[in-house]
């Protein structure tokens, strides 16, 4: 394994490991009820991040390696300016939307969260861009240093406040948003494109939009597809049910190490292979990753599902119940499908055929949105967690079907 790939794995271990430990602290300190409220607010942060990734982060990782050396600095300069505009617009939208939401949300735990929640959502998406820029320029060590500043710092501060018995939801978001903001300030002076005359923002934005118009729609579809059952569980069963689901999901965070490493490494490698060696080599590379990764993910997930209660007792001692055990087993199945989806999406993005992914997400979203409420009403918590797993399985099946169709078409065209 090369030094850069080793650093990527270390970096993802830092991100996934601290994210998991933060969840452990929050569940133990706040309880499943307040943690469920935290999880619902966090959905807003994930939605903003998914939009940023589709409009800026993913195009950056795809287009940057393809830029001629002479044009690359000006491309990064244009991408940075687009990101700063996105950050400004997002700050206004989040502050206004969450403020209105608080006026109609009768939840005492949310008192004093307006400013820190806005800070957390905005700073985290900006940090995600700055982090992606490090990987796009091959500065993996820099990304690791920034992640060490953002994530372990937050974990240490949260743990100290918890040990004093003073951790609240508002303080949680102050810590998370503050740590991300500090990391952004540390990253900005050395960001690629700073001080360079940018390419035309209109042309760069149009290029990103041409690539991401389906990805942006897909991000919206993915958000509703992935969270319909969680929201239905929270609405029908209460915030503790949502907290139990998210707590079980976070235990599967061990698999995020591989998933997130792929998102940072595989798109760049796949784009270079496609440009330098053609379709056959590109398809062989993705197929190998899909096959070996699927087997590894299935093996790990099976072990976690079999020993679900033992694993949960190790992590959340004192708060584990039967709902969390059932949730962890369902999440183990879900993550096998999620791996397949991750690899196939990378393949379609590299081929710049994101319309296929968008269509699959729209079909999957329709099924999830229509079925979530009646399934949870009929089957309760079990319907929520197994519905989430089934929804991911459907998405994986749709993408795999389209990938095989694309593979057959490529093979025929290359042999003609």
Features from the language model and the residues they span:
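Membrane-interface junctions at transmembrane-helix termini in multi-pass inner-membrane proteins
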Residues: 2, 123-145, 333-360
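Interfacial segments at transmembrane-helix termini and the short loops linking adjacent helices
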Residues: 100-116, 306-336
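Hydrophobic alpha-helical transmembrane segments
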Residues: 111-118, 144-194, 363-367, 381-405
């Amino acid at each position: 394994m090369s030094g850069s790939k080793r650093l990527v794995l270390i970096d993802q271990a830092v991100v996934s490991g601290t994210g998991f430990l933060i969840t452990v602290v929050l569940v133990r300190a706040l309880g499943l009820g307040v943690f469920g409220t935290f999880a619902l607010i966090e959905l807003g942060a994930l939605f903003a991040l998914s939009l940023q990734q589709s409009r800026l982060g993913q195009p950056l990782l795809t287009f940057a390696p393809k830029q001629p050396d002479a044009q690359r600095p000006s491309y990064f300069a244009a991408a940075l300016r687009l990101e700063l505009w996105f950050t400004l617009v997002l700050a206004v939208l989040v502050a206004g939307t969450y403020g209105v939401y608080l006026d109609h949300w009768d939840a005492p735990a949310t008192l004093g969260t307006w400013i820190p929640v806005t800070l957390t959502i905005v700073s985290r998406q900006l940090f995600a861009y700055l982090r992606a820029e490090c990987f796009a320029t091959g500065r993996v060590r820099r990304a690791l240093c920034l992640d060490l500043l953002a994530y372990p710092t937050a974990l240490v501060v949260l743990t100290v406040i918890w040990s004093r018995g003073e951790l609240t939801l508002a303080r949680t978001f102050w810590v998370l948003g503050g740590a991300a903001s500090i990391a952004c300030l540390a990253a900005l002076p050395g960001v690629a494109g700073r001080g360079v005359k940018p390419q035309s923002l209109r042309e760069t934005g149009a290029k990103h939009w041409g690539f991401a118009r389906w990805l942006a729609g897909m991000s919206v579809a993915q958000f509703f597809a992935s969270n319909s059952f969680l929201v239905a569980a929270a609405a029908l069963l209460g915030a503790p049910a949502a907290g139990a689901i998210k707590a079980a999901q976070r235990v599967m965070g061990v698999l995020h190490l591989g998933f997130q490493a792929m998102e940072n490494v595989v798109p760049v490698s796949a784009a270079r292979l496609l440009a330098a060696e053609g379709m056959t080599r590109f398809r062989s590379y993705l197929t190998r990753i899909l096959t070996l990764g699927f087997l590894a993910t299935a093996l790990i997930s099976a072990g976690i599902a079999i020993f679900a209660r033992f694993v949960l007792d190790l992590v959340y001692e004192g708060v584990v119940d039967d709902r969390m055990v059932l949730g962890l087993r369902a999440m183990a199945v879900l993550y096998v499908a999620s791996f397949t989806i991750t690899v196939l999406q990378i393949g379609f993005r590299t081929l710049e055929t994101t319309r296929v992914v968008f269509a699959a997400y729209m079909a999957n979203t329709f099924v999830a949105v229509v079925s979530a409420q009646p399934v949870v009403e009929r089957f309760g918590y079990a319907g929520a967690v197994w519905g989430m797993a089934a929804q991911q399985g459907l998405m994986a099946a749709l993408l795999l079907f389209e990938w095989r169709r694309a593979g057959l078409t490529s093979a025929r065209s290359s042999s003609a």
